[in-house]
Amino acid sequence: MFNEILQKIVAETGGGIGAVLMGYDGIAIDQFFSPNEDVDVQMVVVEYSNVLKEIRKTAEILSLGEMEEISIRTDRFIIVIRILTSEYFVAMIIHQDGNFGKGRYLMTRESNNLIEALG
């Protein structure tokens, strides 16, 4: 179920490379990667999961509200991270020239399906 949802998000996002459903502990629940890509999507997301914990803690300390989404741009990629629950998030990597807006939309649209599947 998770793989189908992740594949749909990546396939429908122009320039989508891969997506990972992951816990804040850095353990992937499921993932989908486009073939022949030169980036280790899971490794990128594992490393950013530590940063997410710090951002979440800072937002709580400053009473900024619940974190919903983080976007990171590099000269090659865009990483979009959507928070699902207090334990899980979904992350997608898009080529720099990909359709960032559609990727965000699809991740938001499919969030409830992922949350429901997590039980």
Give short role names for the model-derived ranges.
Residues 1-18, 22-119:
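Non-catalytic interaction/Regulatory regions outside core domains
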